[in-house]
């Protein structure tokens, strides 16, 4: 369906008069061109006006104005360019800040002094290599993370796999120790990365029927401890290691849900 036809269909569905049609057509064309038609994920190539018209037809006539107003005034859409910017800022604004804060705390100095302190600079370089980033889905955009951080993070530190097998853990540990020239080196920071958390349940949830924990965090935990229990692998993470979950976007409800689930899971899981 071309845009002119889609707009006429929208006008019929919403029962707009000529003045309303002219006003709303300007907004629909603008938003389609600047934002919505750039969508490339689950159904790339879908057109905004056509999709909106189809969606609105599920409502009774008296409900359509409210549904349309919701899309126009309340819906938040993050386009490809904005997502890319969020991904590119992940290392400098999140990982780097945690590394600096950790080193400063360990050395008992102020974070703003680390770059002038030779010991701190060396510790930052080492801790940066002891950081591992695991993408939980394609939405983690690990390719963009890799390209945006050449010289900061090596390919061996970026893994797209929600559940790593024992052989992969062995390879990651081997590469870490070779790079640091330290046969006893262990990972100290691990990031679990995904694009969006809407409810928080896919990350961690308790299955009442099965009486067990499930979700991406639990799969990571199982993967890690399976590898640690292998005599050929042993310890992978340092005693004071940090596990961080990072979503490029999340609802407030998902954040609260994940925190609550984590607190409950800590009481249930003994490791």
What spans do the regions from the language model cover?
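PRPP-associated nucleotide enzymes
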Residues: 1-271
């Amino acid at each position: 369906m071309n845009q002119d036809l889609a707009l006429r269909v929208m006008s019929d569905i919403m029962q707009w008069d000529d003045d309303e049609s002219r006003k709303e057509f300007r907004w629909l064309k603008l938003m389609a061109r600047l934002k919505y038609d750039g969508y490339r994920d689950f159904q790339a190539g879908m057109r905004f006006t056509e999709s909106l018209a189809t969606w609105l037809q599920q409502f009774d006539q008296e409900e359509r104005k409210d549904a349309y107003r919701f899309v126009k005034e309340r819906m938040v859409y993050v386009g490809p360019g904005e997502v890319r910017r969020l991904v590119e800022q992940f290392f400098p604004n999140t990982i780097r800040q945690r590394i600096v804060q950790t080193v400063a705390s360990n050395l008992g100095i102020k974070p703003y002094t680390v770059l002038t302190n030779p010991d701190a600079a060396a510790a930052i370089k080492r801790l940066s290599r002891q950081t591992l980033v695991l993408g939980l889905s394609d939405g983690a955009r690990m390719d963009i993370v890799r390209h945006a951080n050449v010289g900061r993070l090596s390919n061996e530190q970026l893994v797209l796999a929600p559940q790593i097998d024992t052989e992969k853990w062995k390879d990651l540990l081997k590469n870490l120790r070779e790079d640091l020239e330290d046969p006893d080196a262990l990972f100290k920071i691990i990031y679990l990365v995904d694009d969006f958390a809407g409810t928080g349940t896919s990350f961690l949830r308790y299955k009442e029927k099965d009486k067990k924990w499930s979700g991406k965090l639990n799969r990571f935990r199982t993967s890690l401890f399976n590898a640690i229990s292998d005599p050929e692998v042993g310890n992978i993470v340092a005693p004071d290691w940090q596990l961080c979950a990072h979503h490029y976007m999340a609802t407030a409800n998902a954040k609260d849900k994940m925190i609550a689930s984590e607190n409950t899971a800590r009481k249930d899981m003994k490791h």
